[in-house]
Regions:
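Exposed loop/turn and edge beta-strand positions of beta-sandwich/beta-sheet ligand-binding modules
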Residues: 75
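Basic amphipathic alpha-helical segments that dock to polyanions
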Residues: 47-54
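Amphipathic alpha-helical dimerization/coiled-coil segments
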Residues: 84-111
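Basic, short loop/linker segments at the boundary and entry of helix-turn-helix/winged-helix-like folds
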Residues: 2-7, 79
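Beta-hairpin "wing" of winged helix-turn-helix
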Residues: 57-72
Length: 111
């Protein structure tokens, strides 16, 4: 990232999901992980748009897997965080923790 380019909520969620899914992170799995962890359904097109932005910012890289018959001979695109992406995720996580620390109503679990 050239200048300080802050990530939006969806970009952060996608970056965190890529990290959670780990080696085999591709669009559908990333979308499912976001849904599982947040309870929000995210359109696959939105996930791919966020992945494209993250890749342009140098926070994730992509590579093509092997073509498979189940995908009509198409290769799946896999994503992984870069070192800059890992740093951005750590920074964002720390910022959120500091912002939320001591907030009334967040000290105990919400039922």
């Amino acid at each position: 990232m050239r200048k300080r380019d802050y990530l939006g909520q969806l970009e952060l969620m996608v970056l965190f999901a890529v990290m959670r899914v780990n080696r085999n992170a591709y669009g559908v799995l990333i979308s499912q992980e976001i849904s599982k962890q947040s309870g929000r359904d995210v359109a696959i097109a939105s996930v791919y748009a966020a992945l494209e932005r993250l890749e342009k910012k140098g926070l994730v890289t992509s590579c093509l897997g092997e073509p498979t018959a189940e995908r009509g001979g198409k290769a799946r695109t896999y994503f992984k965080p870069t070192m800059a992406g890992l740093k951005e995720a750590r920074d964002a996580h720390g910022t959120l923790l500091r912002l939320c620390s001591g907030l009334p109503g967040l000290a105990r679990p919400i039922a």
